[in-house]
């Protein structure tokens, strides 16, 4: 099991979260929030019911241990959306290693019936999506994550997240 870092205390995180979400370190003031999305291998629709509930608990547990703050989380049958605040010492690669690697083995062990859908040694697909989130777009992104899986008019994708058309 990974030990919590001693670089900042829970009180510092909580106190600074109320002041615009900024965290402090020894010589730093930072607000690093990322929108992360990843999928099960083959984009199988296996994140439902007890599996989704357990994944949610495992993600909260991992983030508590690493001293990261979950701002929004949506587990859909075939993908996960997460709005996460981390420290400047955490690379996105290492964050995803903890989130995907730390949940993969436990989910496969606790739900052996998933072998039928996810053969091999991997639960998650290889890739992931990561983007930084500024204060201005955070409200739109939070609503987007909260409304995942709900029927709506239109695509449900914020205009800022839609691909831009480039004319030749």
Regions found by a protein language model. Name each.
Residues 1-168:
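Basic nucleic-acid-binding interfaces
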């Amino acid at each position: 099991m990974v030990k919590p870092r001693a670089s900042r205390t829970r009180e510092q995180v909580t106190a600074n979260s109320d002041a615009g979400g900024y965290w402090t370190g020894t010589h730093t003031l930072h607000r690093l929030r990322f929108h992360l999305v990843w999928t099960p291998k083959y984009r199988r629709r296996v994140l439902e019911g007890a599996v989704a509930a357990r994944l949610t608990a495992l993600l909260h547990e991992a983030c508590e241990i690493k001293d990261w703050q979950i701002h929004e989380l949506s587990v859909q049958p075939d993908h996960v959306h997460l709005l996460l605040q981390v420290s400047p010492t955490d690379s996105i690669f290492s964050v995803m290693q903890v989130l995907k690697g730390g949940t993969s083995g436990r989910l496969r062990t606790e739900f052996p019936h998933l072998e039928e859908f996810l053969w091999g040694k991997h639960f998650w697909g290889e890739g992931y999506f990561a983007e930084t989130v500024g204060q201005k777009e955070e409200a739109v992104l939070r609503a987007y994550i909260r409304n995942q899986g709900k029927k709506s008019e239109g695509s449900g994708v914020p205009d800022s997240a839609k691909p831009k058309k480039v004319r030749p």
